[in-house]
Design a protein with these regions (language model features):
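Flexible, low-hydrophobicity surface segments
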Residues: 1-155, 176, 254
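Glycine-rich loop/linker segments at domain edges
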Residues: 8, 14-17, 83-84, 153-196, ...
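Extended active-site and interfacial segments that coordinate phosphate-rich ligands
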Residues: 16-17, 121-130, 134, 215, ...
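C-terminal catalytic domains of large/alpha subunits in multi-subunit enzymes
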Residues: 70-71, 227-234, 262-269, 324-455, ...
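Short acidic, glycine/serine/threonine-rich loops at helix termini
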Residues: 77-82, 119-122, 189, 210, ...
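Phosphate/diphosphate-binding loops
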Residues: 111, 267-313, 557-587, 591-592
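Helix-loop-helix junctions that connect adjacent transmembrane helices in secondary transporters/permeases
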Residues: 145-226, 395-493, 720-734, 738-742
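Thiamine diphosphate
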Residues: 234, 239-240, 244-266, 270-272, ...
Length: 805
């Protein structure tokens, strides 16, 4: 029997080149002839009208070949399409006003970066400063400064979604609780920042090399902005991207800006973002103010919830926002059975930098609130937090489960996953330890969080931002889908190559694909070469292509498996022809096609490759020459949003159960993690070691947002956290000493391998579980954590205020 590779911790093939400095990142890209360099002039004002430019000194500077201003942008490009009907014109640089500190207002192109930076300081921009507003609640007040006069409001979008009968649920409730939450604006600070090389050819073709991660719907949107046909704009993504975590989705405005600079300068233009630029003006998750209500019975049964959100998207709303509000529509109810829900979602523009996907996109916000309310309800009813959740969990026999908001939970055993987590954590023992600690005056707390982990976003969810009347118009084009492709081919010597349309940023696609193909074709992973460089001129791709939303683990691997199976079927047909046997009488086994019964020749993949390539006459009649197969996989459950605002916003849904124990220092308010257990149900695990790495990384991202990270501004909109001295990112020193990881496997019936996504994982649970643990630790003071991050300073002041009262 051939060795099975799926489910094994095969070492990552990517690591050797990365650890030995042989990676090919955007800044390592083979030199493009006569490349010049760009420096971006950015607004120093949070809100100001642009009165004019003087670029004469910059143009006269040594080595400068072009200066592009907002006037050029307004004349030669179109604004980007946005996901709402509010008239917001978002260009790749400021045209009429600057609306946040760091917004691009001009670009200088010079012989090298040093000369470009020097010349950028010579660009003079005349401003009329205007009042700024950074708080989303204040931005909606009648006398607030309006960022976009054509819109006449700072409210970029608003939807009220009603599922079931929430009014009835609250009327019949025996207990109603209300709470206000605040979630911070933070990013994921990938080790590699944005990078672009653009070359505008004389024939009108623009080639762009960049570390863009997708989705490739941004390709046609960018082509439209630049006035190009789609087949005149070529995106190439290098083999290696130094992390992204959603942030590099938002590089596309800079692609348009640097492409325009190349067109003006008549030379290829390269721009590599520095760290201050990245913190100042790349992208981040939204900060949110939320008001939550829960209706329940005294036995703990949750009847319904109400959500009210104000999501702060910064100076403009840009695609894929307002995904911050609607990406988790299908899993709004989390892992719980309640059927009645009201969502009041407002998207607000303020004088902060712009937002977009950040690891766990919108789910960290969602579960911080929901799991906080579940703990409050347990406290109110005198129930253990685990017991309250158990009474409301979906049961295994309910799967596949259709949520009231339209989600289609494909598989799961939530109680078993919870049981495994509390068993590993020795939950009862922790409670006994807590009782002893409290008796000794220590602040010891235990937190629990249960979340549904959505993966593979359905492109149709974004239309939830539009009201049903707008979507019902004849000219409206419904949107749906989640598609990926793969090609597998065998060369004349029998070596196998897999060609992907993905854009990995460290997830280990080459390793995982080699494992899958090896299993399907009876080979070893060493026999398989994987090519994962994206090129829109040569790859099979769709608007949903890319590596984001934890999609590769299900849609990407499914395309690979199906392509390998198509190729295997062709090998079987060919070998049966050579054996002069019916196809039903042969089988593919142990890397070769063999007779099912009796004696006869067998043909290995290498044998068949040699014959097929060198002697096409040997092929059966009607068989196409060549040994290759392409598969395009999409989900049948990926539908457009319906007239009742229901949508299956993702395509596979995992589950995570976490337990954390912490101690809060009575003198410094420092938080020490004593135990952290995380149990995941992500369907079939293809490579446990890679899965563990994703869970560790996700946990640290969540920890950053919970305890340290926030992009902060003063009241005038000036940016306060422009370096890693001010913007605190957790390091190995701040990481938990141990993360205990386990799995429950409920294979997805929707994917060929039974796999689901895993990449965002604990980034969406940690803010909830650690906030609940700290709240539990500080319960003797009557404190509950409702705002993040819990920096030592903010927590210390919170504790001192509580002690005074």
């Amino acid at each position: 029997m051939s060795e099975r590779w799926i489910g094994k911790s095969v070492k990552r093939v990517e690591d050797f080149r990365l650890l030995t400095g042989r990676g090919t990142f955007i800044d390592d890209h083979p030199p493009v002839g006569n490349v010049h360099h760009a420096a971006i002039v950015r607004s120093r004002h949070a809100h100001a009208r642009i009165l004019g430019y003087d670029v004469s000194k910059a143009l006269a500077a040594d080595g400068v070949v072009a200066v592009i201003t907002g006037e050029d942008v307004a004349k030669e490009t179109k604004p980007f399409a946005v996901g709402v009907t509010t008239p917001v014109h978002y260009y790749c640089a400021a045209t009429d006003k600057a609306r946040f500190v760091g917004e691009p207002v001009a670009v200088v192109v010079a012989r090298d970066r040093y000369l470009a930076e020097d010349a950028a300081e010579l660009v003079e921009v005349a401003y009329e400063p205007l009042p700024a507003v950074i708080d989303p609640e204040k931005a909606l007040e009648p006398d607030a400064p309006v960022l976009h006069e054509k819109a006449g409001t700072n409210l970029a979008g608003h939807r009220r979604l009603v599922y079931g009968d929430p009014d009835r649920a609250f009327r019949e409730a025996e207990v109603v609780l209300r709470e206000r939450f605040r979630f911070p604006k933070y990013g994921s600070t990938p080790i590699e920042t944005y990078g672009i090389i653009a070359r505008w050819e004389l024939d009108g073709v623009c080639t762009v090399w960049s570390n863009f991660m997708g989705p490739f719907i941004m390709h046609p949107l960018t082509a439209r902005v630049l006035g190009l046909a789609e087949n005149k704009l070529r995106f190439i993504v290098p083999p290696d991207i130094g992390g992204s975590f959603g942030i590099k989705t938002s590089i596309y405005p800079y692609i348009a800006l640097i492409a325009l600079a190349s067109k003006h300068a008549g030379v290829p233009v390269k721009w590599i973002e520095d760290r201050r630029e990245h913190l100042l003006a790349s992208s981040s998750g939204t900060d949110r103010i939320a008001y939550r209500e829960v209706a329940a019975k005294t036995d703990g049964t949750v009847l319904g919830m109400r959500f009210k959100w104000l999501d702060n998207v910064g100076g403009y709303i840009r695609s894929p926002e307002p995904g911050c509000s609607f990406r988790p529509t299908g899993n709004f109810v989390g892992p719980y059975r309640f059927q009645h829900l009201e969502v009041d979602a407002s998207v607000v523009m303020t004088n902060k930098s712009l937002t977009g996907p950040n690891r766990g996109y919108a789910c960290g916000h969602l579960y911080f609130e929901t799991e906080g309310m579940m703990d409050r309800l347990a406290e109110k009813l005198g129930l253990d937090p685990v017991e309250l959740r158990r009474r409301n969990l979906l049961r295994p026999e309910q799967f596949p489960y259709r949520t009231p908001t339209g989600g289609y939970y494909d598989s799961g055993d939530y109680p078993a996953t919870l049981d495994k987590a509390i068993g590993i954590a020795r939950y009862d023992e922790l409670r006994r330890e807590q009782a002893k600690a409290r008796a000794a005056g220590r602040w010891f707390g235990i937190g629990v969080a249960l979340v549904v982990d959505p993966s593979v976003s359905n492109m149709g969810y974004v239309a939830t931002a539009l009201d049903p009347q707008f979507r019902a118009k004849p000219e409206y084009l419904p949107k749906s889908g989640a598609v990926d492709s793969a090609t597998i081919k065998v060369d004349p010597l029998g070596r196998v190559t897999a060609i992907l349309g993905t854009t990995p940023q460290g997830q280990g696609h080459q390793t995982i694909v080699a494992q899958i193909v090896a299993d399907e074709l009876g080979l070893t992973p060493d026999d398989v070469t994987v090519v994962d460089e994206m090129d829109t001129f040569t790859r099979v791709w769709s608007i949903s292509s890319g590596t984001y939303s934890s999609r590769f683990g299900s849609v990407g691997t499914s395309a690979v498996a199906l392509a390998a199976r198509k190729l295997r079927a062709k090998l079987v047909d060919y070998a049966a022809h050579l054996m002069e046997r019916p196809v039903a009488d042969v089988e593919f086994r142990d890397g070769a096609v063999r007779p099912r019964a009796g004696k006869g020749p067998s043909y290995s993949v290498k044998d068949l490759a040699g014959r097929a390539h060198w002697n096409t006459e040997s092929l059966p009649e009607g068989m196409e020459p060549g040994l290759q197969a392409t598969a395009v996989f999409g989900f049948t459950v990926s539908k457009a949003v319906d007239a009742e605002d229901r949508v299956n916003s993702s395509n596979t849904y995992g589950f995570i159960a976490e337990v954390m124990a912490v101690e809060v220092d009575r003198q410094t308010a420092a938080i020490r993690i004593l135990k952290y257990v995380t149990v995941h149900d992500a369907g079939t695990i293809i490579n446990p070691m890679i899965a563990e790495g994703q869970i560790y990384g996700g946990a640290l991202h969540g920890l950053g947002g919970a305890l340290y990270e926030e992009l902060k501004y003063d009241e005038d909109g000036q940016f306060l956290t422009g370096t890693f001295m001010d913007y605190l990112v957790p390091t190995a020193s701040e990481a938990p000493a141990e993360i205990e990881i386990a799995h429950v496997v409920s294979p997805s019936p929707l994917t060929p391998l039974g796999s689901k996504g895993l990449g965002e994982s604990s980034s969406m649970t940690v803010p909830a579980v650690i906030a609940n643990a700290v709240s539990d630790a500080l319960a003797p003071l009557g404190l509950r954590i409702t705002e993040l991050p819990m920096t030592p300073s903010s927590l210390w002041h919170l504790i001192r205020d509580a002690q005074k009262t």
